[in-house]
Amino acid sequence: LLVSSENKTKNNKKLQINLALNYGSKTELLNAFKKLKNSKKILNEDNFKNYLQTRDIPDPDILIRTGNTRRLSNFLLWQIAYAEIFFEKKLWPDFNEKDYNRIIKKFKSIKRNFGNI
């Protein structure tokens, strides 16, 4: 299923969807810190981000959490700092295009400030 989906969308350029399988943000952060420490580079956001598993992927603008659970579950803790987070009651298999479009519409109405007041 994943290979088929990847092949069908390999030429798409407008939207990027990432699935994180067997991923844990705490482990990613710890490993990135260890690598940065061993590199002797200055500890700053840019240097740190270069050691994350997701270094070549843009930070998400939207996080959709399905399953009527209001937690992040150790998912992209660094990367979602400025993402808009939507919690959905539906389970992932039941989440459909109508649900997705509703979230996109809501997202477009949000004035994002990226941490500024």
Q: Which residues make up each language-model segment?
A:
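Flexible, compositionally biased loop and terminal segments
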Residues: 1-117
